[in-house]
From Swiss-Prot:
Signal peptide: none annotated. PANTHER family: DNA REPAIR PROTEIN RECO. HAMAP family: RecO. The gene is recO. One of its GO terms (cellular component) is bacterial nucleoid. This is DNA repair protein RecO. The keyword DNA damage applies. SUPFAM superfamilies: ArfGap/RecO-like zinc finger, Nucleic acid-binding proteins. It comes from the Bacteria. InterPro entries: ARFGAP/RecO, DNA_rep/recomb_RecO_N, NA-bd_OB-fold, RecO, RecO_C.
Length: 249
């Protein structure tokens, strides 16, 4: 058995004296593990870091075997990310989200979104909006997508500023006003369907993480006996600290 594919490194663990088991999210073969001979060496260390993109060749005698990887770096992001606390926490959290996907099950849209998210991690605010969008995409991929296209009560498609915590559907300003204290806020950058580069405030980011966090916890994590990762909390705290330092008085 042999295939080649693009991949993003999610995690690495030592195997034996010199080897390493590498976990990739690949474009066409999903989340997939393989053994890299000599992967524990200092020569391989810069390549085998979470967040780096690689061209992978996987070989095994049988499809169900762990198999072996040969990896070639195509985008080495890790060195830059290690200099920023939000990026370190962010890539760890993104990897934990990707691990919610079944192994060896292709999710090309998620792969492409992960790649775009990692490529735009230099700016803290952009990184936060992209990560919120990624969490929304993961909810949809796992069968728990939110309906933010129209008001659940009236069908209106404008002034959608709330989300029902029960149904996960948008609610308009007029319909939601009597119950505003019981509804979640829908951030402007999600309402406007922009690319996350503008139209957000600090409050929008807090609302966004509250929104995705609520549904991830209830629908995905708690049924698996899990909670939010420490990396998610670390990312949010790093973003909050950065925005507080750079706020205009």
């Amino acid at each position: 058995m042999e295939w080649s594919d693009e991949g993003i490194i999610l995690g690495v663990r030592r195997h034996g004296e010199a080897g390493a088991i590498v976990e990739l999210l690949t474009r066409s073969h999903g989340r997939h593990l393989g053994l890299v001979r000599g992967g524990a060496s200092s020569r391989m260390r810069p390549l085998l870091q979470p967040g780096n993109s690689v061209l992978a060749v996987w070989r095994a005698r049988l499809d169900e075997h762990l198999g072996y990887y040969q990896l070639e770096g195509t985008r080495m992001r890790a060195a830059t990310m290690l200099a920023s606390s939000h990026a370190v926490y962010g890539v760890t959290h993104l990897a934990s989200l990707a691990r919610l996907l079944p192994e060896r099950d292709p999710h090309e849209d998620i792969y492409e979104m992960l790649e775009r998210t990692l490529d735009d991690f230099d700016d803290v605010g952009d990184a936060a909006t992209h990560l919120i969008r990624f969490e929304l995409a993961m909810l949809a991929e796992l069968g728990f997508g939110l309906d933010l296209s129209a008001c659940a009560a009236t069908g209106a498609t404008v002034e959608l500023i709330y989300v029902s915590p029960k149904s996960g559907s948008a609610v308009s300003r007029a319909a939601g006003e009597p119950w505003r204290d019981k509804l979640l806020r829908l951030p402007a950058f999600l309402r406007d369907d922009n690319d996350g580069r503008n139209g957000w405030s600090d409050q929008d980011l807090r609302d966004g993480f509250d929104l995705t966090g609520r549904f991830l916890l209830r629908n995905v994590l708690e049924p698996r006996g899990q909670g939010h990762s420490d990396a998610r909390d670390g990312f949010i705290n790093a973003v909050t600290r950065h925005l507080a330092r750079t706020a205009i008085p």
